[in-house]
């Protein structure tokens, strides 16, 4: 039996699961990449490990130094868990209207939590963190939105895993947040096969879908610009909050995958692509989409059991990305 040195060795190498029973096109195969199987519960485990370990190697993060990061959830949880294992104190800035489970998980992992006004969204938390970084130059501000260790983590792990397990992939679908997943995986897959299509899922301008942002809402992550995102993305698909919740419920009901709401958005985007793709006779398209995290952090939102109208209204009041 393989014995791992510690839990950090379990980050990555997540499974692909065939969910083609959801496909609207019999010639389009749907595969879900289960990032909820990472030890701290989300795709952000990858970038948290990458950012901390690279900061250690380049001398930006020293023993006992405080880490600071704005995050409304998954990145903060993963950073807090790894920081606790490695002995770093950590401060997480987050909007005051995130789901209660996220605050609870940060507390479990020993993070200091500073809340920012929910009306300012995640952008407000980022601005506050930038100001605090200037006031506390001895802290290590990792800044996932501009840290190249974010897309590098996906270029070095997520992309190669997908290619290893499914070299016949024709489309890759993921949500737009920091854009790290799309940049890293997209660059890797296109280097392997220039014809692979990279599709971003985003909410409508001014609307919230857990884990996602619209690039036209006024903030373009520096990671997207540094990695020439417009050359990597082939198209974007808009997914509304209601569609995200409906598809999140389908994942549970029809596939037994208990996932977060942004995973439902990824599925909704994949279904749109599956409906549009032109598959040659006797051919097949293979769409891989990201299941970003598990559903346990969203139970208090009622996304899985409440009336759909009620769940949609509740989700729109909560900041997730």
Predicted regions and their residues:
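PLP-dependent amino-acid enzyme catalytic core
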Residues: 1-321
């Amino acid at each position: 039996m393989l014995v791992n040195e510690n839990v950090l060795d379990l980050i990555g190498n997540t499974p692909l699961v065939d969910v083609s029973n959801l496909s609207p096109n019999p010639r389009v195969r749907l595969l879900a990449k289960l990032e909820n199987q990472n030890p701290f519960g989300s795709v952000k485990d990858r970038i948290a490990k990458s950012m901390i370990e690279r900061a250690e190697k380049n001398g930006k993060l020293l023993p006992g130094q405080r880490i600071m990061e704005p995050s409304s959830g998954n990145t903060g949880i993963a950073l807090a868990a790894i920081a606790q294992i490695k002995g770093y104190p950590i401060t997480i800035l987050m909007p005051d209207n995130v789901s209660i489970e996220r605050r609870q998980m940060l507390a479990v992992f020993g993070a200091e939590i500073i809340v920012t006004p929910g009306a300012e969204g995640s952008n407000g938390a980022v601005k506050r963190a930038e100001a605090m970084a200037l006031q506390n130059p001895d802290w290590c501000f990792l800044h996932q939105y501009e840290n190249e260790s974010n897309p590098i983590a996906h270029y070095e792990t997520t992309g190669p895993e997908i290619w290893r397990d499914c070299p016949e992939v024709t489309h890759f679908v993921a949500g737009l947040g920091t854009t790290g997943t799309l940049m890293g995986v997209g660059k890797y897959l296109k280097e392997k096969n220039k014809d692979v299509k990279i599709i971003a899922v985003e909410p409508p301008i001014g609307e919230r879908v857990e884990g996602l942002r619209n690039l036209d809402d006024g903030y373009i992550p520096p990671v997207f610009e540094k990695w020439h995102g417009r050359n990597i993305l082939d198209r974007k698909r808009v997914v509304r909050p209601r569609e995200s919740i409906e598809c999140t419920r389908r994942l549970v009901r029809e596939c037994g995958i208990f996932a977060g709401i942004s995973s439902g958005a990824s599925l909704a985007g994949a279904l749109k692509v599956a409906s549009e793709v032109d598959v040659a006779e006797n051919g097949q398209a293979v769409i891989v989409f990201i299941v970003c995290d598990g559903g346990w952090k969203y139970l208090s939102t009622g996304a899985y059991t409440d009336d759909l109208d009620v769940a949609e209204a509740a989700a729109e009041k909560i900041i997730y990305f």
